[in-house]
């Protein structure tokens, strides 16, 4: 077992928004209130027309300038001299926003496995509460990949009057059976750990083996065959451990020190519920209703959200444009080749100016 040290994870510049109003959740649950951890960069202009919302992935947080650092800087995708960039920790996470590790004010103890089921739409609703508290009613561009990309798409479907333009990356319009099966295998790995205790473990002490195993499984889908072959092949260390084994073990150990098992389960279940068509006329109609400018980034080597899923989005979203990132890094390419991704975002921003 290991203890989490949130002090080393959450930036000192993190701000917090709190709402004491009950939050009604899509699947019928309710939270008595919500706290949102967020960060901003740059200055909101007088017209409030320079807002960029960055949506993070599964184990990310509000510190976008850390996990997506190559996207920040003058002349880059997120330019603090021109843009007002906002990134918040999603509902259900463990980096400052209300989630399973939060104390339930009604019981006086951590929510743990009692945290209600949430969806991507609930995450977007909480982000909207935050932005409205900042006096923002229009977002120039919403950007995100993976779980972040799901939020981007739901922003367009839920609040088209606020969403000026969308750039979802490495994502589908509805979670596939392939992705759902991957998520469930990872959740079962956590549940198989004796320290899991049906989710009622000490919130400061992790079911280490299960969460690490879940992360190791996930890392096999975040990269790809070619990446593992080129990077590790059949190389072995002096102790006989294959380098590929050493790599995934290291990734598992790293996550255990910075994440929470109940949070992992909460967020992967929310991802499994991702479906733009749920409760709407149809999947096709929901995508067809997205009238704002949309650029979709597809990663050629992504085995988790393969190219055909982004091609489907492009086919169903009117006037959308499909871009390809041809890199041998797998799903995580959006985090690795930030030079190319930043350039693509900059080109989209320039096109938005021309079109306006």
Curated annotation (Swiss-Prot):
Its EC number is 2.3.1.31. It is found in: Cytoplasm. Transmembrane segments: none annotated. It catalyses: L-homoserine + acetyl-CoA = O-acetyl-L-homoserine + CoA. The keyword Transferase applies. One of its GO terms (cellular component) is cytoplasm. One of its GO terms (biological process) is homoserine metabolic process. Its main location: cytoplasm. Pathway: Amino-acid biosynthesis; L-methionine biosynthesis via de novo pathway; O-acetyl-L-homoserine from L-homoserine: step 1/1. It comes from the Bacteria. Keywords: Acyltransferase, Amino-acid biosynthesis, Cytoplasm, Methionine biosynthesis, Transferase. Substrate binds at residues 215, 332. The active site is at 146 (nucleophile), 302, 331. One of its GO terms (molecular function) is homoserine O-acetyltransferase activity. Coiled coil: none annotated. Residues 50-335 form the AB hydrolase-1 domain. Belongs to the AB hydrolase superfamily. MetX family. Transfers an acetyl group from acetyl-CoA to L-homoserine, forming acetyl-L-homoserine. Homodimer. This is Homoserine O-acetyltransferase. It comes from Chlorobaculum tepidum (strain ATCC 49652 / DSM 12025 / NBRC 103806 / TLS).
């Amino acid at each position: 077992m290991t203890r989490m040290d949130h002090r080393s994870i959450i930036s000192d510049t993190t701000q917090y928004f709190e709402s004491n109003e009950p939050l009604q959740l899509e699947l019928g649950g309710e939270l008595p209130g919500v706290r949102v951890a967020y960060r901003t960069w740059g200055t909101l202009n007088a017209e409030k027309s320079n807002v960029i919302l960055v949506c993070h992935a599964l184990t990310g947080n509000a510190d976008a300038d850390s996990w997506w650092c190559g996207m920040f800087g003058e002349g880059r995708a997120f330019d603090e001299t021109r843009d007002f960039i906002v990134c918040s920790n999603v509902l259900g996470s463990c980096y400052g926003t209300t989630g399973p590790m939060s104390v339930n004010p009604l019981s006086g103890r951590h929510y743990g496995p009692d945290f209600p089921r949430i969806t991507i739409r609930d995450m977007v609703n909480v982000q909207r509460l935050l932005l409205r508290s900042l006096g923002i009613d229009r977002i120039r561009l919403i950007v995100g990949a993976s779980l972040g990309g799901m939020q981007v798409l739901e922003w367009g479907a839920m609040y088209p009057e606020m969403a000026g333009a969308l750039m979802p990356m490495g994502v589908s319009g509805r979670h596939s059976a392939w992705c759902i099966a991957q998520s469930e295998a990872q959740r079962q790995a956590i549940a198989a750990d004796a320290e899991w205790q049906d989710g009622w473990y000490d919130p400061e002490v992790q079911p280490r083996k299960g969460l690490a195993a879940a992360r190791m499984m996930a890392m096999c889908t975040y990269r790809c065959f070619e990446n593992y072959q080129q990077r590790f092949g059949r190389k072995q260390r002096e102790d006989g451990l294959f380098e590929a084994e050493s790599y995934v073990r290291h990734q598992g150990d790293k996550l255990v020190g910075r994440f929470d098992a109940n949070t992992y389960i909460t967020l992967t279940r929310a991802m499994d519920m991702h479906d733009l068509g749920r409760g709407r006329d149809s999947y096709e109609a929901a995508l067809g209703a997205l009238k704002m400018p949309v650029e979709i980034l597809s990663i050629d080597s992504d085995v988790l959200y393969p190219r055909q899923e982004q091609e489907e989005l492009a086919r169903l979203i009117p006037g959308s444009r499909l871009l390809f990132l041809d890199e041998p890094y797998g799903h995580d390419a959006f985090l690795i080749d930030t030079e190319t991704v930043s350039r693509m975002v900059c080109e989209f921003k320039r096109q938005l100016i021309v079109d306006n």
